[in-house]
Structure formats: structure tokens, C-alpha cells
């Protein structure tokens, strides 16, 4: 295969990874809007909260735009989240540059270093452009740029880097409207038929999981009775804690120790 065809293939794979990531992030945001806090995708919950001390599950306003055309730059995603905490509102504007990785075993390679440097330049330019284009107003907005490395297979978050946030003042509503108007990608809305098919699939998976859990429980009881008859003391099992929250509460684990 020629070098040009390899580059074209890599470009297509990267594009596909971007759109899949957008779709998952959009579903997360939609779940927040509908009040389904427990319906987060576990990968997305790490992305925003720990970097800004904003609880996205308590957002009063969320605006998200993809492939935003700002002229010199086109950030992959710009997300504006407004929350209320103890009566005081807080607004964060996240700029997300996404870098997809075909091979995720080693994040420290020349190719990924080039992607990192390119992403940093893109974020700095985008911050300046957003500051220039923000309509005049009194709203305080904290602009937070994020460089996100994600694996093409599985959409696993590999590394998230945040540039120092900057506070700007402007009209929040007009800024969100402007960004939505210049966005060049909108995640597709699933048809009713497709939603029903996915719902049936989820119900089927849940029923299988319940049957499997019952089967495991029965076998565990049988094993316990056998060991008890032999006079064996079994250790108590602590219930496992499921991941609560989801790519909006996972860019948390990466920064919770920092």
C-alpha cells in the first residue's frame, strides 16, 4: 500500500473516531438535560468535572457545539456549562481538541508528541479567537482548554492535558448561540425504529445478566453449603462498587490525585 493511501486510511479512521466520540459525549449531555444522572457513559465522566470543580450533573444550562468554525481554527468541541452553587452561578467554557490513537500501548511516541504540540497550538489559538468573538457583556466565563488523547478502539481516554484556564467577560447567551451557528457537525438523531431496536437489545442484555446473576448466586450457595458441611470458614465478600458517573464525571480519576 502506498504512503498516500496509508495516510488517507489513517485520516478516515481518525474521522470515524472523532464522530463516535462526539456521539457519546452528546448522549451524556442529553442524559444530564433529561435528569438521568446515572445514565452517564463511564468514560465520559472523567472529562470535565475534576478539571474545573464543576458538577455537570447540577448544570442549569448546557450548550455543546462540534467542529466549530472560528476561521483560523476549528476546535473539535466547545461545551459551555453553567451551574448554580449556593446561589452563585459559575460558567465554564470547555474547548476540547481530540487526538485519536490507533496504537495506545505507548503514549510517548514521536507521532503522539507531534500530535501533542499541534494540539497545544490549536488550543492557544482557539482561546484567543473565542476571546475576540465573545459578545460584550457582564457574564464571567472561565475558558478551559483540554487536549484529549483517545484510543480509536474502545474510545478509552488515554491522556488529558489542561492548559491554564482564563476568565473572560461577555454575553453568555449570545456566545453560546454564535458557537452553535458556526458548528459544522451535528450528531445524528436516531430514528424511532432504531431507538426501539436498541431498547429491545438492552432489555435482552439485562435479562441475560439477571439470569447469569441468579445462576452464580445458586452455585455460590451450593459451594457455601458444601464448605460449611466440611467445617471451612469462608471470608466475607464485600459488595463491589460500580462506577457512578460517567466521559463527563472520567476525566476525574486522572486528576483526583493531582
Curated annotation (Swiss-Prot):
Keywords from the UniProt entry: Host cytoplasm, Host Golgi apparatus, Host nucleus, Late protein, Virion
Any idea what this protein is called?
Answer: Protein UL24 homolog
Q: Where in the cell is it found?
A: Virion; Host cytoplasm; Host nucleus, Host nucleolus; Host Golgi apparatus
| Species name | Varicella-zoster virus (strain Dumas) (HHV-3)
User: What is known about its induction?
Assistant: Expressed late in the infection cycle.
Annotated function: May participate in nuclear egress of viral particles. Plays a role in the dispersal of several host nucleolar proteins including NCL/nucleolin and NPM1. Since deletion of host NCL/nucleolin negatively impact on nuclear egress, UL24 supposedly acts on this process through its effect on host nucleoli.
Tell me its family: Belongs to the herpesviridae UL24 family.
Record keywords: Cell membrane included?
no
What do the Gene Ontology cellular component annotations say? Answer: host cell Golgi apparatus; host cell nucleolus; virion component
